[in-house]
Amino acid sequence: MKSRAAVAFAPGKPLEIVEIDVAPPKKGEVLIKVTHTGVCHTDAFTLSGDDPEGVFPVVLGHEGAGVVVEVGEGVTSVKPGDHVIPLYTAECGECEFCRSGKTNLCVAVRETQGKGLMPDGTTRFSYNGQPLYHYMGCSTFSEYTVVAEVSLAKINPEANHEHVCLLGCGVTTGIGAVHNTAKVQPGDSVAVFGLGAIGLAVVQGARQAKAGRIIAIDTNPKKFELARRFGATDCINPNDYDKPIKDVLLDINKWGIDHTFECIGNVNVMRAALESAHRGWGQSVIIGVAGSGQEISTRPFQLVTGRVWKGSAFGGVKGRSQLPGMVEDAMKGDIDLEPFVTHTMSLDEINDAFDLMHEGKSIRTVIRY
């Protein structure tokens, strides 16, 4: 079938809006019509050429919502007409990782997904007879996309796709990191480095967890109003100080902050976040994705004296079994999604959405098909 899509033909180049061919779903696969998709920093990271798994030409996009059109052989968990959110972190329930109960990092389709391919090692997309790669198992920058059954969360059909599509990545990643990775407790102190969608979601999650002091940190003070709305008690611009941000936080509590979250992908900030964590028990959670080849460092004494350095992917959330409940929470108002959507655009305007993001003028732009 034909589908309009925003295709990245080469790194560092604007996306091109073209009509592509989408093949029917094969065994264990599902064809969906995407209704809405967010434009995320991870899409921009891959488009920049810095992503070690980046392959081109590719249909980007991984933060979407849509409706099932057709199912392949053996698919039982969804049917045509079901409303779904594609998942870049699958949940098969059968691999060693799923069975462990310790992680959400399912490996059922990981090997092929990282190569831009479907589980059978081929692609369902083509343009002028030439194959196009998939992206993170989702490719939501196409009006129609094919996704593995294990990479789909079935959601309430009454949910507002313009809002809940954000649960496909950014908001879930931030809120989940608070509850699942850090396990923030009532009264704990929290510092959030970077107030994009993920960082703001961490702030909201910290408020849900009844954290005592929630410190929001960004060099763009325009982000502070929304951070306060989501629950920040303090907003700090590092540019307002003539000393490292670590020292600013240690002035707040000389022993450090109970939980720090790095939501940028800057290895220097990752170190500052760790070294701002509380001596004896502080945790620092890395959420931001650093560029290819970059490494983190600190003095071992930081860890010897009780700090813990952790990472979080998709907030530790198991997509098929847990994400539908988060959609219900959003519908009840327990998760506030609307403020994240600062702009809505058509697919033809998608390059403008990337520009807004790079200029710091948007939190999330949602593309409506």
Swiss-Prot record:
InterPro entries: ADH-like_C, ADH-like_N, ADH_3, ADH_Zn_CS, GroES-like_sf, NAD(P)-bd_dom_sf, PKS_ER. The keyword Nucleotidyltransferase does not apply. It holds the Pfam family ADH_N. Binds 2 Zn(2+) ions per subunit. It comes from the Bacteria. Belongs to the zinc-containing alcohol dehydrogenase family. Class-III subfamily. This is S-(hydroxymethyl)glutathione dehydrogenase. The gene is frmA.
